[in-house]
Amino acid sequence: SSYLFELSQTSKVLLMAKKIIVHAGFHKTGTTAIQSSFFAARNELSKAGITYPEVGGKAHHKAIYSLMGKTWGWEDRGGVLANDKKWRDFVKQVKRAKSTALVSSEFLCELTEEQIVKFKNDLGCSDIKIYFTLRPLLKIIPSAYQQHLKIGIKSNYEKWLHSILDEPGVSTITPSFWVRHMHAEVLAKWVKHFGKENVVVIVVDEKQPEFMY
């Protein structure tokens, strides 16, 4: 029985990426373009020993929604509450990577500490690097407002600005804004669980936006 136990543990080690690169945000920092590039280059990445898992779409949002237990789509327009199946399937894909797995979703920046711990434990890899792309908040705000308009908020720009800036950290109209954009707090949570040596911030150069590619 001890032999079988050792064999099962060995198989678990074999079914694991040697390294995982995680692009965790932030929102409105060119993430969609980056993810489109990853998706378009997945065959080339594979030849280089990097696996970019597929879960529907060019990014890994559905897997992260599954981890978070969030509703995929608009709640009042037929959105579906995610169960953990997508996340479990995604983890299997990551662990099957022969060398390096690449994970990308800006919704990772919204994880609670408990969810970050689960993310880390489920992936089960000792070599994980977390990358965040960052732009000045002043550049993010107009783009964030446009995004919120797409999902149905009715407030005009001035009213919305007051809702997020009168009391930074609190937003009565779009609560997710500060969950996503209290950048220092988000970074602190990831540093706490992965170590500062494993969390990298890349500041987007507005004059040379293509440098990220």
Regions found by a protein language model. Name each.
Residues 4-7, 11-101, 105-107, 137, ...:
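PAPS-dependent sulfotransferase catalytic core
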Residues 44-46, 113-213:
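PAPS-dependent sulfotransferase catalytic domain
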Residues 106-109, 175:
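The substrate-binding groove and active-site-proximal loops of carbohydrate-active enzymes
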Residues 1:
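Conserved small/polar residues in nucleotide/adenosyl-binding loops
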Residues 38-39, 57, 112-114, 144:
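Short, function-defining helix-loop hinge/capping sites that tune catalysis or transport
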